[in-house]
Design a protein with these regions (language model features):
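Divalent metal-coordination and catalytic microenvironments
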Residues: 1, 11, 52, 78, ...
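Alpha-helical multi-pass transmembrane bundles of energy-transducing inner-membrane proteins
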Residues: 2-74
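Interfacial and helix-entry/exit segments of alpha-helical transmembrane bundles
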Residues: 7-17, 67-106, 112-122, 129-143, ...
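Alpha-helical transmembrane segments of polytopic integral membrane proteins
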Residues: 17, 56, 60-63, 72, ...
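Juxtamembrane/transmembrane-helix interface segments of polytopic membrane transporters
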Residues: 24, 64, 103, 111, ...
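Membrane-interfacial helical/loop segments at transmembrane boundaries in membrane proteins
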Residues: 31-36, 113-127, 200-217
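Predominantly late transmembrane helices and immediately cytosolic-facing juxtamembrane segments
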Residues: 56-60, 134-171
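Hard-cation-handling environments
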Residues: 173-217
């Protein structure tokens, strides 16, 4: 089920966000609000939360359009929709590659911040992170690899391979513009936030993080 795949991937993405919040919280507890890792962890978490809302929201809408156009969300029945649904294919490629952490999309930037925070936390004398903490970046890298793999398979199973009209309840067709306008807007934000991340980080996220630090002090 396409929506099931996206739902399970949301669990992993939320795990990434909570990991960054956890790094920020631990750093704040041991080093205070002036810790660079505290600010970096919370900025990365909020940044990825917004990025995730853009690419995953678009993917769920695109999946709904595919379900409406073909009558099914079963991956085994889908395939070969590239020439039939070219606009949906383009939107899916952009948002899925963002989810996989491929540049120049916004998911790459927040995943880079996540991996950077995971590596930096091992250099701090926090609990036993200088020993057991070496596992954190390794687990993060493995998780990122799995995310990339299922993201690519998501594209391949839907749009490539052989088209099987006999397996579909309806004759496949491109989604209407009314159904495409919302994912187009979100996909545009994926590109804009990837190319111009300062729109979010410098104008919204970093001031909010600094305000929290001042309140805590």
């Amino acid at each position: 089920d396409l929506k099931g795949i996206l739902a399970f991937s949301t669990v992993s993405q939320l795990g990434m966000i909570m990991s960054m919040l956890g790094i920020g919280a631990v750093s704040y507890h041991y080093q205070g609000a002036n810790s660079q890792l505290y600010v970096a962890g919370f900025v990365a978490a909020i940044f990825h939360l917004i990025n995730h809302a853009t690419f995953k929201g678009a993917l769920f809408m695109i999946t709904g359009g595919i379900d409406h156009s073909t009558g099914t969300r079963d991956v085994k029945k889908l395939g070969g929709l590239l020439t039939i649904m070219p606009i949906s294919f383009t939107l899916t490629v952009i948002t899925t590659l963002s989810m996989a952490g491929v540049p120049p999309f916004n998911g790459f930037l927040s995943k880079e911040k996540f991996l950077e925070a995971m590596i930096n936390v091992t250099h701090l004398n926090l609990m036993s992170l200088n020993t057991l903490g070496i596992l954190l970046p390794i687990i993060a890298i493995i998780g990122s690899i799995f995310t990339f793999v299922y993201s690519i398979k998501f594209i391949l199973h839907i749009f490539f391979g052989s088209y099987k009209p006999e397996a579909l309840p309806k004759q496949a067709h491109e989604s209407s513009m009314l159904m495409l306008i919302s994912p187009i807007i979100l996909t545009s934000l994926v590109i804009v936030f990837g190319l111009f991340p300062s729109i979010l980080t410098q104008s919204i996220i970093e001031p909010a993080s600094e305000a929290v630090s001042q309140t805590s002090n």
